[in-house]
Amino acid sequence: MDGNTEDLQKFVPQVHFEQIPIKNLCSNQDYQRNLSIKHVQRAAANFDLYQINPVKVSRRDGINYVFNGQHTIEIVALVSGSRETPVWCMVYDDLVYTQEADIFANQMKYVKSLLPYEIFMANIEAGNDRELIIRDLVESYDLTITSSSRPGGICAVSTLINIYEKYGFHTLDRVLRLCVATWEGAPMSFSSNMLNAIARLDNAYGETMKDDTF
């Protein structure tokens, strides 16, 4: 290995990957958070094998301590019905307890969360029905779903999804129709507060609220 390659290795974690049965993993360290049974049950009910990440493990004194993936192993155990089930683990052999705790505490410090718009557009690319239906409905009014506020654009993506999920397609359709007819695509008319308010009005009053007198 030449000198340059050795220098580059400084930026590569010294780990190896193993499949380890869940029963051989320990996640009761004091720095660990409490296990959320509700989260485990919800994730298990919507289990997707391709969303399972490798579990990060510190091997100390022959014991496999989980410092990232506590809920993952419980989800897999619940879905598979066995703690004999193996999971892929990214194993560190050179950590001490305080390093594990520090990594656990700061693991999300520089992680950039996905924005609702980014999630929505990825679901479009994946061909997921809900997002395709919402996009087509929005575009039927000559509007677009956008990442920021602009004329004729809707950036309140989470609100569109929430209205669709809570009240249904026809309420979302009417909300958009009323906004377009009343404010003609003005950006503020598609704010989260405005969309939610009209959805609640429609839910409360239904057909007694006339479009032409809105």
Residues covered by each model-derived region:
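Short alpha-helix boundary/capping and kink motifs at helix termini
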Residues: 1-90
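Solvent-exposed functional surfaces
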Residues: 82-214
